[in-house]
Structure formats: C-alpha cells, structure tokens
Amino acid sequence: MGLHSGDTSELFFNDMRVPSDAVLGGLGKGFAALMDELPRERLIMAVGCVAASDGMLDWTIEYTMERRTFGEPVAKYQNSRFAFADMKTEIELNRALVEKSVNRYMKGDLSTEDAAMCKLASSEMQGRVADRCLQLFGGYGYMSEYKISRAYVDARVQRIYGGTSEVMKEVIARSLVGR
C-alpha cells in the first residue's frame, strides 16, 4: 500500500546453530533487549511524524495559494485558513511534546509511558494532518502523482508499527492504574 521504498520480507532460520561466543547480549535475552529500545524507537517515530506533518502543511499551503476556485486561491477561503491554523497548532503542540521527550531521553530519563504518549499523539496527529491536507488538494490529492497522496498512505502505518495506537494506550493506562 505505502512505503514503496521499504523492502519488507520474512526471514526463516531453520536448523540453525549459533556458537555461544557469537550470541549478542546473552542467550534468551533478545526480547528484553528489544523492549529496552522501544522507547527510543517510538521517540524517533514521533520526530518523523512531526517533520512529515510540517512538510504536508507546507506543500498544502503552497498548493492552495496557486490553486484557484471561483476566481480565488483556495488558501484565501476561511475554511482553508482555519484548517491551516488548526493543523499548525496541533503540529506545534506535538513538537513541544517531542522536544520534552527528546530532552528526557538525552538525560536518560525517558520512560516507556512518556515515549508511548509521544508516539500516540504524534502519529494520530500525522493521520489527521494528512487527511486534511489531502482534502484541501481536492481531487488531485487522491492521485498518486501528487506527493500528498503518497504521504497520506505512508502516514497510516505510523499508527501501526512500533506498537499500534491501541498498544500505546494500554502502555499509558498501565502506568496510571496498573495491569
């Protein structure tokens, strides 16, 4: 569907032996090592969500300044202007959360739930921004020749990989009320 530049495939390791001196991190500790890296991975995703949203908004403003309907640039209509204001506000709110989380990470103090909140908020925001931007492109936004169409499709996976939005909510809820 999206991310056409990414090559995804399955790997199968049947009847394979790894010498004990070649095991990284210790036998049976791979899952724990993976879990330790998830907050950083989710933070990186959140940074990407904010950056992608910034880009989509920029493209959309540029396009709607040029595209005319009823003799006026689409950007001049109140609906478009309010959409720009809403999206910019949401992007900046998420940027603040990402920056706070980056600072915590740099101090070695980024919790699993903080990273989950950051990833949840920014990936959901990216989906909303992609949808509104595509709408402002009109019919052209639906055509794959336009980068907003590709960005819309690519935004969808942000709410899936690194832990789905539902998993992020569970991580956050557990930090509040336990299992």
Predicted regions and their residues:
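FAD-binding subdomain of flavoenzyme oxidoreductases
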Residues: M1-E10
